[in-house]
Amino acid sequence: MEVKDMIELSSKQNCTGCSACANICPRGCIRMTADEEGFLYPKVNEEMCMDCGLCENVCPMLHKPQQHELLAVYGAKNNDDAVRFTSSSGGMFTLFAEEILQQGGVVVGAALDEQLAVQHVLVDSIADLPKLRGSKYVQSKIGKIYSEVRQILRAGRKVLFSGTPCQIAGLKKYLVKPSENLLTVDVVCHGVPSPKVYHKHLQELAQEAGEPVVQVKFRDKAKGWKQGETLFFTEHQRFGASKRQETYMRLFLNNISIRPSCGECAFNNKRSLADITIADYWGIDKQYPEFDDDKGVTLVLVNSEAGAELLAQVKDKAELLTTDFAKGAEYNVAVSKSLPLNPKRAFFFEHLDEYTLKEMVERCLE
């Protein structure tokens, strides 16, 4: 059986791993397979392939979907402080998700499974919504979730799909035709770290503790929103530090462990394809200090009329502040541009299997 390493859709440098090609293939001959860095790329069984061209047609890097025009920008806080405390920023995603669930729809987003891997899942009850809440700084596995979303839309139910901008692009290209029952929320994305690096970190912490890691909190707010910590728990021990000091997060935030395509994101700077974009509203303590209580504020970019309608449906459960794109991007660089890959990135992945992540931090960042 002949298997080609990668479909020549976009170049490997540009491939986001969105998985639209694997979902659309009518013969199931495309598999998303991890490369030596741990990122998923498409592989095709050429003996099964009938050259239908569908995979090329749905590649969002070859054929970009139509973009929205930015309509409005807000700072926003969920009125429920308990929800806000367990959210990464201001808890607005939960309000959007609850609204769709109350309308009889389903919500799709990234969740941690029993092995602490990150993958996209469907949620159809408010009780299960917490698993989607909060940032997960690992590229999530899409699997066949686009296919499941299409089936639900065809059944006439609403779907709120959340993910990175490239995942939203992949979904929309896969669906081909727009659906009034589909609402999309993307997150302003610094880049997606390698699952291989993430699991290496979990394994090294487990070795140090003598027991497995059982819980991960990427953005714990016990010390406040701005001083948030990244924490890893075993049954008896806790590991972690502020997000700028923790080993795994340092590699991520310094653009060492992220996917190659993230160095030149095609979907930031008002190029989102989602109805709503959400992010941390960093710097609001300087711009609007009266609005900041260090419990978290969401930057909300409304990109479509459907997004505006969804925000209107939840506005009575939130506190909103009108702002603009320039202010929202002033202290959150990822809103408006990508940061280049770290010059030490190639060295990092070349020697990843030889050293611990702590040793790699010393070699690459100190």
What residue ranges belong to the model's regions?
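Local cysteine-cluster metal-coordination motifs and their immediate loop/turn environment
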Residues: 13-28, 50-62, 164-170, 258-270
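Ferredoxin-like iron-sulfur electron-transfer modules
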Residues: 1-19, 29-51, 214-215, 244-253
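Long, compositionally biased charged/polar accessory segments in the mid-to-C-terminal portions
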Residues: 103-106, 211-366
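A short alpha->loop->secondary-structure connector
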Residues: 128, 176-187
